[in-house]
């Protein structure tokens, strides 16, 4: 059985006072998946999300399941939110990031978002 998963392809965030907006780009735009198989989603930022003051990379991943609000999966690059199964992992550095699902389950279907947290409007 194959399950459809929808991904948000482009997020643009306006940052006042910034010389240019931070643009977040996700690939692929959609991803057919098979239960039990691995899957990964890539995210690229137009600017580094590494905070030189504290060494943290402010990139989060969210999953919005059908009919529900988005739920936090991964925060600050690689930390799983409470209750998130360990089949989810986040990695990357600077401007290139990956969300990996080691073994896809039916409940993983939804819209996945990457979000930068280094600058806010």
Curated annotation (Swiss-Prot):
Q: Which UniProt keywords apply?
A: Adaptive immunity, Cell membrane, Disulfide bond, Immunity, Immunoglobulin, Immunoglobulin domain, Membrane, Secreted, Signal
Q: Name one GO molecular function term.
A: antigen binding
Q: Region (Framework-2): which ranges?
A: 61-75
SMART domains annotated for this entry? IGv
Q: Where is this region: Complementarity-determining-2?
A: 76-82
Q: Where is this region: Complementarity-determining-3?
A: 115-121
Map out region (Framework-3) in residue numbers.
83-114
Q: Report the record's Gene Ontology biological process terms.
A: adaptive immune response; immune response
Where in this protein does the record put region Framework-1?
Answer: 21-43
Where would you find the membrane-spanning parts of this chain? none
> What Pfam families is this protein classified in?
V-set (PF07686)
What's any one GO cellular component for it?
plasma membrane
Q: Which Cys residues form disulphide pairs?
A: 43-114
Q: Where is this region: Complementarity-determining-1?
A: 44-60
Location of this chain's protein in the cell:
Secreted; Cell membrane
Among its keywords, does the record have Magnesium? no
Q: How does it assemble?
A: Immunoglobulins are composed of two identical heavy chains and two identical light chains; disulfide-linked.
Role description? V region of the variable domain of immunoglobulin light chains that participates in the antigen recognition. Immunoglobulins, also known as antibodies, are membrane-bound or secreted glycoproteins produced by B lymphocytes. In the recognition phase of humoral immunity, the membrane-bound immunoglobulins serve as receptors which, upon binding of a specific antigen, trigger the clonal expansion and differentiation of B lymphocytes into immunoglobulins-secreting plasma cells.
Q: What is this protein called?
A: Immunoglobulin kappa variable 2D-40
What species is this protein from?
Homo sapiens (Human)
- List the gene name: IGKV2D-40
């Amino acid at each position: 059985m194959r399950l459809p998963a929808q991904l948000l392809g482009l997020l643009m965030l306006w940052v006042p006072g910034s010389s240019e907006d931070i643009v977040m780009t996700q690939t692929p735009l959609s991803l057919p998946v098979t239960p039990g198989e691995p899957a990964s989603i890539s995210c690229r930022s137009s600017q580094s999300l590494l905070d030189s003051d504290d060494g943290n990379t402010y990139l989060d991943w969210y999953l919005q399941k059908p009919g529900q609000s988005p739920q936090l999966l991964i925060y600050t690059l690689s930390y799983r939110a409470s209750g998130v199964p360990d089949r989810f992992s986040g990695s990357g550095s600077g401007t290139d990031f990956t969300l990996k699902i080691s073994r896809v389950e039916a409940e993983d279907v939804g819209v996945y978002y990457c979000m930068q947290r280094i600058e806010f409007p």
